[in-house]
Amino acid sequence: MVRVKICGITNLEDALFSVESGADAVGFVFYPKSKRYISPEDARRISVELPPFVFRVGVFVNEEPEKILDVASYVQLNAVQLHGEEPIELCRKIAERILVIKAVGISNERDIERALNYREFPVLLDTKTPEYGGSGKTFDWSLILPYRDQFRYLVLSGGLNPDNVRSAIDMVRPFAVDVSSGVEAFPGKKDHDSIKTFIKNAKGL
C-alpha cells in the first residue's frame, strides 16, 4: 500500500487529524520564504505530541548542513527533505546522520535523468517552480515511466489532490505520495475533508 505524507503542517490540529486519518508522515517546512513556513520551536511543540511510528519530515532549501542537523535533532525529525539545489556530496554528508529524501523539480525528461543521480536516496519528484514546491501544479507523469524501475523509493508530489491521486498512483506506482496545497483551505491551514478523502483514495480504502 502506498504511503502518504501530508506536508506544510503548521498546527497541531491538522497534524493529529492527518495521523488519525491514516497519514504515514507529516512534513514541516523550514524554508523561511515559504507560505507554509513553521519555526523549529512550533514544529517541536507539534512533534512531541504525535504518536510513535509517525514519520516526521523536515523540508529545507539550500540550507547549511549544520543548521539542518541541529533542527532535525531539536524537532525530533525522522528524515529531512532537501528541496533545493543540494549537491550529492552534501546529501551524503547529511545522510550519515539522518535519512535524506532528495526532491527534484521536474519539467522535462532531462530533469528525470538528473533525479536519477540521487537514486541512492529516496527521491521526491515535484513540479519545477521558482518557489520550490507547493505550487498546486502537476507535471507530466508519463515522463517518469521509462525510468520508473531505476528508482528504488520514488515519492510523487506536485499538484496532487483527492481527485487525481488515484490515477497518479495507478500510472506511476510510487512508494509514497506527498501533498500540501491539494488538501488546504488556505496556505498553512488544511481542509480536513480533503485530507480524509485524499488518504482514502491514495490507499484505496
UniProtKB/Swiss-Prot annotation:
Keyword Amino-acid biosynthesis in record: yes
Q: Name one GO molecular function term.
A: phosphoribosylanthranilate isomerase activity
Does this entry carry the keyword Isomerase? Answer: yes
Family matches, as InterPro entries: Aldolase_TIM (IPR013785), PRAI_dom (IPR001240), RibuloseP-bd_barrel (IPR011060), TrpF_fam (IPR044643)
The species is Thermotoga petrophila (strain ATCC BAA-488 / DSM 13995 / JCM 10881 / RKU-1)
Matching entries from SUPFAM superfamilies are given as: Ribulose-phoshate binding barrel
Q: Which reaction does it catalyse?
A: N-(5-phospho-beta-D-ribosyl)anthranilate = 1-(2-carboxyphenylamino)-1-deoxy-D-ribulose 5-phosphate
- Pfam families recorded: PRAI
Q: What is this protein called?
A: N-(5'-phosphoribosyl)anthranilate isomerase
Q: What class of enzyme is it?
A: isomerase
Q: What is its EC number?
A: 5.3.1.24
Q: Which GO terms describe its biological process?
A: L-tryptophan biosynthetic process
Q: Which UniProt keywords are given for this protein, alphabetically ordered?
A: Amino-acid biosynthesis, Aromatic amino acid biosynthesis, Isomerase, Tryptophan biosynthesis
Task: Kindly tell me the pathway this chain contributes to.
Answer: Amino-acid biosynthesis; L-tryptophan biosynthesis; L-tryptophan from chorismate: step 3/5
**Family membership:** Belongs to the TrpF family.
